[in-house]
Amino acid sequence: QAPPKRQDEKPVQHHSAAISLGLVLTACKEIGLYTDGQIRSWRDLCATASFVRGMLGISADTWKEAEADMGEETAAIAIACILERTETIRSPGGYLRALAQKARAGSFSPGPMVMAILNAREPVAA
């Protein structure tokens, strides 16, 4: 029997679409390399994202703004996705600011970002 889920392991709800921590971690494997253990909860992901944001050159002010505009968990998902795509994102801080602006306007959901990363990995059927 599986252990009961802790409160902080519930899927993040955005625009009626839920995204699970497991899906985020399946898509965004890189973030797991920056923890001394495993990411087992949203709290773990948020703490790891807070650490990684500095390595990406994202200022503390930009991070706090993103957390305020998106919510802590969504901001952490955004960092995990940005980390996964560092080779294609020239300015991680600017990118996060743009996402935070969209969130403030109510037009951002992390689901499409996560799915785009997953779909990019899928082999194309011939």
Which role fits each region the language model picked out?
Residues 1-126:
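Electrostatic interaction modules used in gene-expression and signaling proteins
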